[in-house]
């Protein structure tokens, strides 16, 4: 009886069965270990990041910084406040705050009482919410994506490269926008818009009745969305 059972499993059948088990194992997703770490910093009112970040910024509340992602990457992240600006970069023993080392998989959760400035360099993505009055200067260098919502009195924006900025949900009285390269920006000024484009960039505004002044060098354009 035992002999007959063994005979039914030929070498070919065993190979097929083992291959099926291996394929199932390889197809199963392998989840990398993730962790989070809260950083203690001096007070700050501006933020600067570089690399392939996902950054969530909440305006309104006490300063806080939480880094989330793979443990080995979190350990390399350096946070420091210089003249009221929170800088986040990779600590590799060199001048690294604005290194474009790949940080894919990391997310920074930031809370700030007020946001006077925000800079994103590289190919990261930033979402900012809760802006409420005052003046904020934004800068996007590279191919990243920047989104912000809320309300401001005055908005300043500089885009260097091919990045995309969506501020259609950020109402502002006055806006000043400069694009160097092929980037594009959508904004919502209600009174005035001053735009400068050097290259093929595009600026779109969403509200009627805005007084627009523009200087364009190249094939760029300013238009009502």
Residue ranges and their predicted role:
Residues 148-225:
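Short, surface-exposed interaction patches in beta-rich subdomains
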Residues 33-35, 123, 143, 182, ...:
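Short, recurring structural edge motifs at helix starts
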Residues 2-9, 28-121, 127-139, 149-156, ...:
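Acidic (Asp/Glu) and glycine-rich low-complexity loops/linkers
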Residues 13-27:
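Bacterial N-terminal signal peptides
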Residues 124-128, 144-147, 162-165:
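Short helix-to-loop capping/linker segments positioned immediately adjacent to catalytic or ligand/cofactor-binding
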């Amino acid at each position: 009886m035992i002999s007959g059972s063994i005979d039914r499993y030929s070498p070919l059948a065993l190979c097929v069965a083992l291959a099926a088990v291996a394929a199932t194992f390889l197809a199963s997703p392998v989840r990398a270990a993730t962790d989070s770490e809260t950083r203690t910093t001096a007070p700050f009112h501006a933020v600067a990041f570089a690399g392939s970040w996902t950054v969530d910024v909440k305006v309104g509340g006490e300063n806080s910084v939480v880094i989330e992602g793979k443990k080995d990457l979190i350990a390399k992240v350096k946070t420091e406040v210089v003249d009221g600006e929170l800088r986040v970069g990779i600590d590799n023993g060199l001048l690294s705050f604005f290194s474009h080392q790949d940080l894919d998989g990391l997310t920074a959760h930031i809370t700030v009482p007020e946001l006077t400035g925000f800079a994103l360099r590289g190919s990261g993505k930033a979402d900012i919410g809760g802006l409420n009055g005052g003046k904020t200067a934004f800068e996007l260098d590279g191919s990243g994506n920047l989104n912000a919502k809320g309300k401001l009195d005055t908005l300043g924006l500089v885009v260097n490269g091919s990045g995309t900025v969506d501020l259609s949900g950020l109402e502002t009285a006055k806006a000043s926008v400069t694009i160097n390269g092929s980037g594009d920006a959508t904004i919502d000024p209600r009174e005035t818009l001053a735009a400068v484009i050097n290259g093929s960039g595009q600026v779109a505004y969403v509200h009627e009745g805005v007084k627009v002044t523009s200087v364009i060098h190249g094939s760029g354009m300013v238009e009502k969305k």
